[in-house]
Amino acid sequence: MSIHIKQSTMVRPAEETPNKSLWLSKIDMILRTPYSHTGAVLIYKQPDNNEDNIQPSSSMYFDANILIEALSKALVPYYPMAGRLKINGDRYEIDCNGEGALFVEAESSHVLEDFGDFRPNDELHRVMVPTCDYSKGISSFPLLMVQLTRFRCGGVSIGFAQHHHVCDRMSHFEFNNSWARIAKGLLPALEPVHDRYLHLCPRNPPQIKYTHSQFEPFVPSLPKELLDGKTSKSQTLFKLSREQINTLKQKLDWSNTTTRLSTYEVVAGHVWRSVSKARGLSDHEEIKLIMPVDGRSRINNPSLPKGYCGNVVFLAVCTATVGDLACNPLTDTAGKVQEALKGLDDDYLRSAIDHTESKPDLPVPYMGSPEKTLYPNVLVNSWGRIPYQAMDFGWGNPTFFGISNIFYDGQCFLIPSQNGDGSMTLAINLFSSHLSLFKKHFYDF
């Protein structure tokens, strides 16, 4: 698909901002490699009659000038996003130098319908999400990049490339909400808090009370012959209606559990089982379920301030053999998920912070496999609490929100319906040879 870049603007904060270095916690640094951004897209389909949605000060649907001006104002309280990474000794910092965020305005001769259901893929990412050149060094590229793309049908997309060292998805969408509110002439809903050292520094002396295997590489050695013919990967979407979710939950044996299981716990357990069955591994092989968890509500001694802007993502991990996942009921599997999530309390997370800081060479947790490596584990990332409906810049709510590209086999995202009908969509990357079996098991209930 063709795309034409009309202009690229480095948007600086509208006012003078603090010129300082911002300390990053190990939690900030280990979720992604420093030479990478995370992509997401918002889709807005222009209404047939949009008189009530158009900004009164603009005759253009999604006026770039309004968005750029609002972005410049939003970068004042969120000034680290206008900075650059730098290295200080053995760790990264954010140089809050106000160099700016990249805003790209583009247009395409295609229509939004050409992208079908907006499943994540390389082409969607290429067309809708901005990129940068990493070859010039760690301080050369912006930490936030945004692209407004107009399509022939009148609809638009806003693609984000966000650097994970700056903040996690929740903080990023709080920033987007502030940007959207400013574009409508409103004040930001939250005042961001950027001091990571004050709130997430390690204790002295460290108090490591648990074994934190979730911060170690997750790739075990598997027989090479299992890889034969499995070099092509596919990204796709699988939808679960409210009725299907209720049917799945009705299959649970509630007599064997003393607590109620949440929808996420049930669906995540179901995905874990379905992927395990689809891969055709031996019964004795272990398969882990890895779940990124927002620690904001779990850290309470002391609690994080409202508006904390940084990474508060920790990993909950369940382990089972392929045979156990196939034979045991879903109630047991979902119970394992619940148990792993409950274990991430304040005491455990503070211990995890101390553990990460005590390991100077701690690697990025391996959340999937590179090309030509068979990876037995599954990562299920929930986007259920992301306020995507707050992304109204003055022209109405998005009609779609999702990840733009999933790079690793076994990585998936659970995204709730945008229309509030109780359904959810699973975006997943698997080897192409596993997809048909996964679909069979995923809908077999």
Swiss-Prot record:
Keywords: Acyltransferase, Flavonoid biosynthesis, Transferase. It comes from the Eukaryota. It is an enzyme of class 2 (transferase). One of its GO terms (molecular function) is anthranilate N-benzoyltransferase activity. It catalyses: anthranilate + benzoyl-CoA = N-benzoylanthranilate + CoA. Induction: By fungal elicitors. Elicitation triggers a rapid, transient induction, reaching maximal abundances within about 0.5 hours and returning to basal levels within 4 hours. The active site is at H164 (proton acceptor), D392 (proton acceptor). It holds the Pfam family Transferase. Its EC number is 2.3.1.144. One of its GO terms (biological process) is flavonoid biosynthetic process. N-terminus is blocked. Catalyzes the formation of N-benzoylanthranilate, in the course of methoxydianthramide B, a phytoalexin. Phytoalexins are produced in response to infection by parasites, and are essential for the expression of disease resistance. Belongs to the plant acyltransferase family. This is Anthranilate N-benzoyltransferase protein 3. It comes from Dianthus caryophyllus.
